[in-house]
Amino acid sequence: KFAETLLEKVENKDFIAGVVGQNIVLEGMAFTVFEMLETGSREFNPKFAQTLTGTIADERRHVGFGENRIGSLIREHPEKKAEIEKMQQEMSYYMLATFSDSFKADDTKPRAAAPATTNADFHGTNLATATPEQMEAVLANTVLGEFKTRLARVGIEYQTPKMPA
């Protein structure tokens, strides 16, 4: 449903909602997921971590473009704010549901014991020792925090999504 929501805006030629969905919500989620993967890869796969560092920088540029463009568009079309806020809330819910499903699936797999020297700290959570629930929570909280910050910069009020069951 996440992709369907975004594609619906694109198919309806709703440029403003499409840019918010793509450059704030989707790209904002992507760079946070990549940051988490990069943190977890630094010690054991530094080449992959370095690749992710470049990917994260690229995603941040996309988000920055979206912020710059959306701010001016929202000022020109304030009537779009309520619709975009609803879309952000809907897309955020689907994103959280995807995270929940992914980490529940991961919870069924046996986890290898992490070496004692591993300290992959991601926003206060050691990914080497965190449970799937803890990883899901830190990822969701980080992404939603980024959304709040970025949406406020462009004049859109963040809407708290329902939490998936």
Predicted stretch roles:
Residues 1-165:
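Non-heme di-metal
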